[in-house]
Amino acid sequence: MKRRLAFLLSIMLLAGCTKQTANSSSTSNTSTSSTNENSGGCAAFAECESSEDEAKLYEDLLTAHNTPFEKATMEDVVSYFENKESHILFLGFRDCPWCQDLMPILNDIAIQKNIKIKYVNVRPENTKESDLRNENNPTYVKLQELLGDVSGDGTNKIYVPYVGVIRDGKVVDFMLNLDYDAHTVQITESQIEEYKTRLNELLEK
């Protein structure tokens, strides 16, 4: 189980860490990252699993009394575009280890900035079989068109975590995760600081 930094985990006590430290030199830029689920994000139906303690922390942040996260559906997100609304969007799921690393950082920054974030759980039943990123799901196909080439490989596949800024029904900018294997390595302090910098810049747009 990964050891979280104290300032991010004041609400919980976790056991020792069994992961190695991530290489902080392996990163992605603001709008791109690796599309390999073993090094940079969870693909649709990929084996992305974590401990129950990690998953519980993720869910606790979503349901805290002061949470900045507002639950939404893919259908809701499509309507934001169609109605030319402005929102901050976070796509993820509880067992995605990269989502778990990003969540407390995004949570703290959103609270500091008094920003609400629309959260879409792409695996509502917490299983890979329930993943909504299915090419047979017309809402997902529509969302792919609206978000554009998120993965940077021309496939329009959506990897998580995904944080995007929608202004007047258009994607202004977005951020994926840093490029490291969150299944086996612990996020470093320098990577946490990089996440903070990028998120602060993104949420100002």
Where does each model-flagged region fall?
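Positively charged n-region of N-terminal signal peptides that target proteins for export
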Residues: M1-R4
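C-terminal motif of bacterial Sec signal peptides marking the signal peptidase cleavage site
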Residues: L13-G16
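Bacterial signal peptide processing site
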Residues: T18-Q20
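N-terminal leader/targeting and pre-domain segments
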Residues: S26-K84, E194-K205
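Short active-site neighborhood of thiol/selenol oxidoreductases, capturing the structured segment around
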Residues: E82-R94, L106
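Thiol-based oxidoreductase modules, predominantly thioredoxin-like and allied folds used
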Residues: L91, I115-K142
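Typically the conserved alpha-helix immediately C-terminal to a functionally engaged Cys/Sec
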Residues: Q100-K113
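Non-catalytic, surface beta->alpha helical segment in thiol-disulfide oxidoreductase systems
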Residues: G154-K205
